[in-house]
């Protein structure tokens, strides 16, 4: 079977959530046939060493960036005057319906590729990218819905920290998609979703739950071990280039961490991962008990030293990999209701996880776990087996195989 995988996320490096998902999808698809990678990204955004690794380890057959919103429609006439300003204005004001039309840069490149190479199936990540390809959804085309624009905009409306303008803007964008997106989903041969509840989204009633696999570190995971009873270390891992992570971190630092330190004066909060601007990192570094570590060689030692981890996320789409990783390393996680989405079937609030909404409740959950080592260890021990089972590569690859075999039988 010859498979064309189209994605906007490079499969390397895998310390970023979207990249990790792309790499694991390619790995699962490769168990069913030959996989060609078409990367819908700007080559200038890829550091040369990263691109070299991608070319070395994957069958890269195309690298073309979709046009920016400022390059489409009437915006394109004004863009030469001030590209940066026009792109930002178009991101705020351009109709979101245009995101679901064949892209003037991407579609011709893919048309040429598919004229030269016979593919048995196309797998594409994200509805907007799939529609930009110009490939007929009934090719057969498997749509990998790892996040949805509807969920993203809805989360911005529901975010307790969102201002009036942000909520109104998100509501306007959501209204543009309400009538057109469900019909587009229904045109595809098959849709994969990352969370079981995503099948409740209009248009995805026929979707198959694919989920995501946990990418185990080289050398494997350490055996489940209790946390150090004396540990007062709390950690958050993520890429802070990703806005939901940066906003969630800021919410925790401003509204929750002072309450935790007031009750547990020796508590330490480690912020791990790339993407914080130097001014923001410097400001956080002045917060008592907070340590900005940035990118670290290995996350293992920090999980070993911490009492538990955090996922204070309020916006976005898809699923929070940081929750899965925490349990894989044997540490419980304190989550917001939004970060809990996708884990309802394997983590139970109060028995294997702590879900808290208000700043006061979130702080209380952290304080209680810092003071009760036995409880945090019970939560981790109860959650780890279910998480590793539901998010195993074997289950994930099995769903991929069943889908492609079913499509092949219809051809």
Model-derived features: positions:
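N-terminal subdomain of nucleotide-sugar transferases
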Residues: 1-64, 117
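Conserved catalytic-core segment of nucleotide-activated headgroup transferases in glycan assembly
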Residues: 21, 209-305
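Conserved nucleotide-sugar donor-binding subdomain of glycosyltransferases
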Residues: 75-130, 165-188
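A charged, aromatic-enriched C-terminal amphipathic alpha-helix characteristic of glycosyltransferases
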Residues: 101, 374-404
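Donor nucleotide-sugar binding/catalytic pocket of nucleotide-sugar-dependent glycosyltransferases
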Residues: 142-143, 150, 170-221
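Acidic donor-binding loop of glycosyltransferase active sites
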Residues: 189, 301-318, 329-332
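Short hydrophobic beta-strand element within catalytic cores of glycosyltransferases
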Residues: 322-326, 332-339
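Conserved acidic donor-binding segment of nucleotide-sugar-dependent glycosyltransferases
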Residues: 352-360, 368-374
């Amino acid at each position: 079977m010859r498979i064309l995988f189209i994605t906007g996320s490079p499969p390397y490096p895998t310390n970023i959530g979207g990249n990790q998902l792309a790499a694991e999808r390619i790995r699962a698809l490769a168990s069913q046939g030959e996989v060609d990678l078409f990367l819908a990204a700007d080559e200038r955004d890829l550091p040369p060493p990263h691109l070299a690794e991608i070319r070395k380890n994957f069958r890269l057959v195309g690298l073309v960036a979709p046009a920016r919103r400022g390059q489409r429609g009437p915006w394109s006439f004004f863009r030469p005057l001030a590209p940066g300003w026009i792109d930002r204005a178009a991101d705020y004001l351009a109709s979101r319906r245009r995101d679901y039309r064949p892209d003037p840069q991407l579609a011709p490149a893919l048309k040429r590729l598919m004229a030269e190479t016979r593919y048995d199936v196309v797998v594409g990540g994200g509805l907007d990218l799939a529609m930009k390809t110009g490939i007929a959804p009934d090719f057969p085309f498997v749509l990998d819905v790892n996040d949805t624009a509807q969920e993203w905009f809805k989360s911005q409306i529901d975010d307790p920290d969102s201002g009036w303008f942000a909520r109104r803007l998100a509501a306007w964008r959501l209204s543009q998609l309400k009538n057109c997106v469900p019909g587009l989903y229904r045109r595809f041969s098959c849709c994969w979703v990352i969370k079981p509840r995503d099948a409740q989204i209009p248009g995805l009633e026929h979707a198959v739950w694919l989920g995501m696999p946990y990418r185990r570190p080289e050398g494997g995971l350490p055996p489940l071990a209790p946390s150090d009873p004396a540990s007062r270390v709390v950690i958050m891992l993520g890429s802070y280039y990703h806005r939901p992570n940066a906003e969630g971190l800021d919410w925790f630092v401003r509204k929750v961490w002072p309450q935790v330190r007031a009750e547990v004066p020796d508590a330490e909060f480690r912020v791990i991962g790339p993407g914080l601007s130097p001014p923001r990192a410097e400001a956080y570094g002045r917060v008592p008990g907070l340590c900005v570590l940035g990118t670290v060689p290995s996350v293992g030692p920090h999980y070993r030293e911490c009492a538990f981890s955090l996922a204070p996320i309020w916006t976005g789409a898809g699923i929070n990999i940081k929750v899965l990783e925490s349990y894989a390393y044997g540490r419980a996680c304190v989550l917001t209701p939004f970060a809990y989405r996708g884990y309802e079937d394997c983590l139970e609030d109060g028995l294997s996880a702590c879900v808290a909404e208000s700043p006061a409740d979130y702080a209380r959950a952290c304080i209680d776990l810092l003071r009760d080592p036995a409880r945090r260890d019970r939560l981790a021990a109860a959650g780890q087996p279910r998480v590793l089972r539901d998010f195993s590569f074997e289950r994930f690859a099995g769903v991929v195989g069943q889908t492609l075999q079913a499509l092949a039988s219809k051809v």
